[in-house]
Amino acid sequence: MMVDLFKVDTPRRAVLAAIAAFAAMPVLAATPLKVVATTGMIADMVRQIGGEAVVVRGLMGAGIDPHSYRQTRSDIVAMTRADVTFWHGLYLEAPMEEFLADWDRKSSVYAVADNLDPAQLITHADYDDSFDPHVWMDPVIWAQCTSIVVDELTNLYPEMRTLFEENASTFVQEAVALDAYSRDTLMKVPPKSRILLTAHDAFGYFGKAYNFDVLGIQGISTESEAGLNRISELVDILVDRKVPAVFVETSVSDRNVRALIEGAAAQGHDVSIGGTLFSDAMGVDGTYEGTWLGMIDHNVTTIARALGADVTARGRLGKLAGAA
């Protein structure tokens, strides 16, 4: 049975039993670090780096939109009991920005994107002096976010520095391999079909990394509204460029995407839904798609197949249930 170390009334015996499970590791000086992470992508990264030296609680699960999420009472309780909280930054968790800034004055709170070089970021069209926050869509950039996690876990648990650094190195190597797979797979899409149209503009870094034209019905934030002019403009693009497929997202309504399909059909061009992509949230916990690696593998494989590439539905490691 999983021991919930975030509960203040967790029996001491249960905590000791959990620690005993680390027998194959160096002797731990304390109980595992209690970590809170806002998004699933960050929670997955911290679990991969921290291993059994951390217990991670993610605030936003599968299908949850971070652009509109607000902290709950249970979130605040978890953060109160945590040793450290990691959030994304770059205005991703916009409704929580003020709360997190205030929390930072009384607890350990760190934005994993803080150390990224602005030169590699995409300017945010909706806000002045801001950037597109969806950096996890580019494996090379996302791997750089491990540095803050390693530094802060090590500050709290210096005895486990080697574990954290080795796990982070493994994470980076996996990210590099995923980037290579993505590049090779997406090159199989015919050049004229390299157009990715989704519910909102979350795939800018994907497009920049893999030479795709990326179009979102809504802006970078799902809080922006799509007007009739935008829908009409995108319908014309679908028809003119004979785009075969568009994509829905797990954390965004498909209403606008279906309006596009209907608009294109009215002009005599059939467009299908190429599949469901993970944009701002990963898949269900406990599944391959419920990890960052699985999330990106699924997206790349789904996009490639829907746009004409002859690639396996099982993905990079053969772990996908089948792109859909």
Model-derived features: positions:
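Extracytoplasmic metal-acquisition and chelation regions
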Residues: 3-7, 30-324
